[in-house]
A protein has these predicted regions:
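Glycine-rich phosphate-binding loop and adjoining beta1-alpha1-beta2 segment
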Residues: 41, 46-70, 74-75
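Short, conserved clusters of charged catalytic residues that mark active-site
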Residues: 16-17, 58, 92
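ATP-dependent adenylation/pyrophosphate-handling site
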Residues: 3-52
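Metal-dependent de-N-acetylase/amidase catalytic core
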Residues: 1-7, 24-28, 53-54, 68, ...
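A short, flexible beta-alpha/helix-coil linker loop
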Residues: 39-41, 80-83
Length: 223
């Protein structure tokens, strides 16, 4: 992996899914993160209200700090409506991802899993598959897991087939980055807690013969 594009429905998904990888490869690969939607207005009856718009700016600021802590300086925010991507024409999302692939020319793309309970994640997954057709420059496409979403997809469980080993420092860096999203974390047993993040890393390591790991599913291509 030399140029890696991470596609996230909302700010914080990128850290939850790929934070350890970002830490481990920060000096070995070039990364860009694309945020398709904002992550807050689904909590408001009127998404266009001033308070909701301030929350979007706040959360985008969290994302910048989190990514900078992991050495990532390439990112962009499209701020489509959170929780409402099912009302957004699929082609609009497709075009966003196609545009970013053309601009960045990645060899590897990470995106959401189609097993997630979150419908926005499904829309982003579908758009990624369309935008990374076999004739594109992308050599491999992988999906990642997002705590508080992937594990709730009870009808269609996430079945990883790629495990990326992480050091203790990588796991700590992942948590430290997630902490910038101060409105999105809580105490254990909430999944997006320090213990939750570290427990999942340990479990994925147990599955793959490592002390810690992040899990992915290879959708297309070779490693």
């Amino acid at each position: 992996m030399n140029k890696v594009l991470i596609i996230a429905a909302h700010p914080d998904d990128e850290i939850l899914g790929c934070g350890g990888l970002l830490s481990n490869l920060r000096d070995q690969a070039e990364f860009k993160v694309v945020f398709v939607a904002e992550g807050t207005t689904c909590r408001y009856d009127k998404p266009s209200c001033q308070e909701a718009q301030k929350e979007i700016e706040l959360r985008n600021g969290f994302a910048v700090k989190a990514l900078n802590s992991l050495g990532v300086t390439h990112y962009c925010f499209y701020n489509l409506p959170c929780g409402r991507l099912d009302n957004t024409p699929q082609i609009e999302i497709n075009k966003i991802i196609e545009k970013e692939i053309k601009l960045f020319s990645p060899d590897t793309v990470f995106t959401h899993s189609n097993c997630d309970s979150n419908k926005d994640h499904h829309k982003v997954y579908d758009a990624t598959i369309i935008a990374t057709r076999p004739q594109s420059l992308v050599k491999r496409v992988l999906s990642y897991e997002v705590l508080s979403s992937t594990e709730w997809g009870f009808d269609k469980a996430f079945s990883p087939n790629v495990f990326y080993p992480l050091t203790e420092k990588n796991v700590q860096d992942k948590w430290d980055a997630l902490e910038f999203y101060e409105t999105e974390i809580k105490e254990f047993p909430y999944p997006r807690s320090e213990k939750g993040i570290k427990t999942l890393a340990s479990y994925r390591g147990l599955q793959s013969g490592h002390e810690n790991a992040e899990a992915y599913k290879l959708i297309r291509g070779t490693l």
